[in-house]
């Protein structure tokens, strides 16, 4: 298995598909990486030489924020919003939907399981 950005990518899959196993790299980015490094998108990971894997690794390190760094960056952005006390930060702090969804009904994923209220059944 090839190891790129701390992730073991599957060897039997095509290179662009295998690169999407890295957090922060989607389909478009994976195809752009293959094009930039000069690797055919139809090749499989087990067909790559060590030099090609090294080229992919260096390109990702130089141009993309991936895995732990990306997660840390997202968490810092959320923390910044919460510290500012803006509306989005308050919604994060209260574990409510941030992007304007309704909360009268639904939003159970964000709010958690429904809390039982005594005397509700009538």
From Swiss-Prot:
GO terms for molecular function: rRNA binding; structural constituent of ribosome; tRNA binding. GO terms for cellular component: cytosol; small ribosomal subunit. PROSITE patterns: RIBOSOMAL_S13_1, RIBOSOMAL_S13_2. One of its GO terms (biological process) is translation. InterPro entries: Rbsml_uS13_C (IPR027437), Ribosomal_uS13 (IPR001892), Ribosomal_uS13-like_H2TH (IPR010979), Ribosomal_uS13_bac-type (IPR019980), Ribosomal_uS13_CS (IPR018269). Keywords: Ribonucleoprotein, Ribosomal protein, RNA-binding, rRNA-binding, tRNA-binding. It holds the Pfam family Ribosomal_S13. Residues 98-122 are annotated as: Disordered. Belongs to the universal ribosomal protein uS13 family. HAMAP family: Ribosomal_uS13. PANTHER family: 30S RIBOSOMAL PROTEIN S13/40S RIBOSOMAL PROTEIN S18, SMALL RIBOSOMAL SUBUNIT PROTEIN US13M. Located at the top of the head of the 30S subunit, it contacts several helices of the 16S rRNA. In the 70S ribosome it contacts the 23S rRNA (bridge B1a) and protein L5 of the 50S subunit (bridge B1b), connecting the 2 subunits; these bridges are implicated in subunit movement. Contacts the tRNAs in the A and P-sites. Part of the 30S ribosomal subunit. Forms a loose heterodimer with protein S19. Forms two bridges to the 50S subunit in the 70S ribosome. This is Small ribosomal subunit protein uS13. It comes from Ruegeria pomeroyi (strain ATCC 700808 / DSM 15171 / DSS-3) (Silicibacter pomeroyi).
């Amino acid at each position: 298995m090839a190891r790129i950005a701390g992730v073991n990518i599957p060897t039997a899959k095509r290179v662009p598909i295998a690169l999407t196993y890295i957090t922060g790299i989607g389909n478009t980015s994976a195809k752009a990486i293959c094009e930039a490094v000069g690797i055919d998108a139809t090749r499989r990971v087990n067909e790559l030489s060590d030099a090609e894997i090294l080229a992919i690794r260096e390109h990702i390190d130089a141009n993309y924020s991936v895995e732990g760094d990306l997660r840390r960056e997202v968490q810092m952005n959320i923390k910044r919003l919460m510290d500012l006390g803006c509306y989005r930060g308050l919604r994060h702090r209260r574990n409510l939907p941030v992007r304007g969804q309704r909360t009268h009904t639904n939003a159970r994923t964000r709010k958690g399981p429904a809390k039982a209220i005594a005397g509700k059944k009538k």
